[in-house]
């Protein structure tokens, strides 16, 4: 079974790059579209990142490390999910990368999630599409 596949989604927003970047990095904004999760991080490269919340009645705490933080261009972190059923060790962490571009008032965001099986990739792409639509509802108001 392949586990080196990459989930990839992309969306255009009719919103300024600065507003979309805020939606991707501000804990208050994130809580509104990311299934109610509480983000805990200072966005320092090498620093921790945590997503804490409840999913379908079960508490979770996903954690990882901020790998890249280039404001309004790129954001990257790895993470492990307590809901994954996998042991908390580096080989079970996934890498998430956000890339942003803007042209003529349209901001494009691409999200990549590495290290997926075929089934997990499809699930991840569907989840990220829901997240991006939630961001759209927030930034295009």
Model-based region annotation:
Residues 1-4, 52:
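Extracellular beta-rich ligand/substrate-recognition surface
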Residues 8-9, 28-61, 72:
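Short beta-edge strand/loop motif at the mouth of beta-sheet-based domains
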Residues 23-24, 69:
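Conserved catalytic core of Hanks-type protein kinase domains
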Residues 39-42, 58-104, 114:
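Hydrophobic-ligand binding "helix-grip"
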Residues 49-51, 74-78, 109-111:
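Short hydrophobic/aromatic-rich beta-strand segments that constitute the beta-sheet cores
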Residues 115-141:
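A conserved amphipathic terminal alpha-helix motif
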């Amino acid at each position: 079974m392949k586990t080196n596949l990459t989930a990839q989604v992309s969306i255009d927003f009719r919103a300024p790059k600065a507003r979309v970047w805020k939606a991707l990095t501000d804990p208050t904004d994130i809580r509104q579209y990311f299934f109610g999760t509480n983000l805990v991080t200072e966005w320092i490269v090498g620093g921790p990142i945590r997503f804490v919340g409840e999913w379908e009645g079960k508490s979770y705490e996903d954690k990882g490390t901020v790998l890249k933080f280039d404001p309004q261009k790129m954001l990257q972190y790895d993470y492990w999910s307590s809901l994954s059923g996998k042991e908390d060790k580096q080989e079970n962490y996934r890498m998430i990368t956000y890339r942003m571009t803007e042209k003529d008032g349209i901001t494009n965001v691409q999200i990549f999630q590495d290290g997926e099986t075929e089934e997990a990739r499809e699930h991840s792409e569907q989840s990220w599409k829901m997240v991006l639509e939630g961001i759209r509802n927030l930034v295009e108001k």
